[in-house]
């Protein structure tokens, strides 16, 4: 459960109307992430775990936007019903010059947005760029979709898939 301080903080988050236990929990996640982001000096709203991202997305509190390449989505998989706005494309990867314009077509600048990449690195750069142009509630999903590569064989640790969160592959 949450302390009265956490509940009060959640109820004040962005002036949200917080009434149910799930609302309180969702807004507490965002408030905690934002506070940690401010303390760390992040240039975006903050970080959330894959489990927190699923909770926020499945409760329709936030948009989950996949910033990986189209090839990654096709070959590795993706979270159903998530928009795709590639941060970078090509080989070697180059920043998508239309990223901000494409993001603006998917989300309002006041929406709560969770950005997901492979390991949580590209999504940080994408979150910083979005914040710079006025997106106020942009969060990075740490560990990303696949997690961090931990050895030469490509074994990963963490990530959306490792927590058995919903995903599909075409």
What is each PLM-predicted segment?
Residues 66, 120:
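Conserved G/P- and acidic residue-centered "switch" motifs that form tight phosphate/ATP-binding loops
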Residues 115-116:
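Short, surface-exposed ligand- or partner-binding patches at beta-edge/loop junctions that are enriched
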Residues 2-62, 70-112, 123-170:
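Rhodanese-like catalytic fold shared by cysteine-dependent sulfurtransferases
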């Amino acid at each position: 459960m949450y302390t009265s301080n956490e509940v009060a903080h959640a109820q004040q988050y962005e002036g949200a109307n917080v009434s149910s236990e799930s609302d309180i929990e969702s807004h507490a996640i965002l408030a905690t992430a934002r506070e940690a982001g401010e303390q760390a000096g992040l240039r975006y709203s903050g970080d959330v775990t894959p489990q927190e991202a699923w909770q926020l997305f499945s409760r329709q509190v936030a948009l989950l936007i996949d910033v990986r390449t189209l090839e990654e989505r096709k070959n590795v998989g993706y979270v159903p019903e998530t928009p795709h706005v590639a941060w970078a494309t090509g080989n070697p990867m180059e920043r998508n010059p239309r990223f901000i314009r494409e993001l603006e077509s998917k989300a309002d600048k006041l929406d709560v947005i969770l950005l997901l990449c492979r390991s949580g690195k590209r999504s940080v750069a994408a979150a910083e760029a979005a914040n710079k142009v006025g997106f106020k509630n942009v969060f990075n999903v740490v560990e990303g979709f696949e997690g961090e590569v931990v050895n030469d064989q490509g074994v990963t640790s963490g990530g959306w898939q490792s927590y058995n969160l919903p995903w599909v592959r075409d």
